[in-house]
Amino acid sequence: MEALQNLGIRRRLKRFFRRDGRALIFAMDHGFEHGPTDFEPVWEHVNPKVIIRKVVRAGIDGVMMLPGIARIAGDEVKPDVGLMIKLTSKTNLRPKPDQLLQSQLAYVEDAIKLGADAIAATVYWGSPQEDTMIRQFAEIASYAHDLGYPVVQFAYPRGPYIDEKYGKKEDYRVVMYGARAAAESGADMIKTYWTGSKETFAKVVEAAAGVPVLMSGGAKTDNPLDFLKVVWEVIEAGGSGAVVGRNIFQRENPESMIRALIRVIHRNEDPEEAAKAEGLI
């Protein structure tokens, strides 16, 4: 991919990935996309400064947030932690059919002014509004790449046709398609769904043709060990890590969860041993 030859893009990507080529990134866009009720399990985390301070202290590799949160709490992201600014989003206040489109909240220049190391946008592959999001992503990627900034695509298959043909949006065939479409549309990093098994996720990674694939953390699991096991399978499948929100900020002990995830992602530790070491089980 021509963009990956750009020194600026390569250097900024390294802000997120350690020498092992893997990353653990904290997601902080839920207040907008899901609403503040997502923070009710641990209400103090509704304050972005509080939770970002905790995750940075625990050793997170990168933090993803929307532009407004970057203005409010961006100072909590230390210089050795990658900052990813997501330029598109939507709320759950819309009627369901209208939730298949993410609108642009800000521009590449805004993200750069906020100190972004990478710029992110979502495409709902298979949505009736897919063409609008493709155009948005293309414009963001083209301009960001011209300025030497990597672009992350949240590649989410979603829509009535997906449900009708594949039964669920996590079917590996459609996740694999979305990952390939993300790579072919110019993404430098891909965030997408877990497909349910190491074998199927390996196909998603291969379909992305060398672009790093990170798993979307999804809903909080009741047992922390269950989530650690999934992340371990992602790594075993050749995935490059995870972008995690609720499985961190909805827990009373987010620092322990992050340290356990670091053990699994960066040290290749057994999930159960990692959980025990951090007091999660």
UniProtKB/Swiss-Prot annotation:
It holds the Pfam family DeoC. Keywords: Cytoplasm, Glycolysis, Lyase, Schiff base. It catalyses: beta-D-fructose 1,6-bisphosphate = D-glyceraldehyde 3-phosphate + dihydroxyacetone phosphate. It is an enzyme of class 4 (lyase). It comes from Pyrococcus horikoshii (strain ATCC 700860 / DSM 12428 / JCM 9974 / NBRC 100139 / OT-3). Homooctamer. It is found in: Cytoplasm. GO terms for molecular function: fructose-bisphosphate aldolase activity. Its EC number is 4.1.2.13. Its main location: cytoplasm. The active site is at residue 191. It comes from the Archaea. The gene is fba. The keyword Kinase does not apply. InterPro entries: Aldolase_TIM (IPR013785), DeoC/FbaB/LacD_aldolase (IPR002915), DeoC/FbaB_aldolase (IPR050456), FBA_class_1 (IPR053414), FbaB-like (IPR041720). GO terms for cellular component: cytoplasm. Disulfide bonds: none annotated. Activated by citrate. This is Fructose-bisphosphate aldolase class 1. SUPFAM superfamilies: Aldolase. Belongs to the DeoC/FbaB aldolase family. GO terms for biological process: glycolytic process.
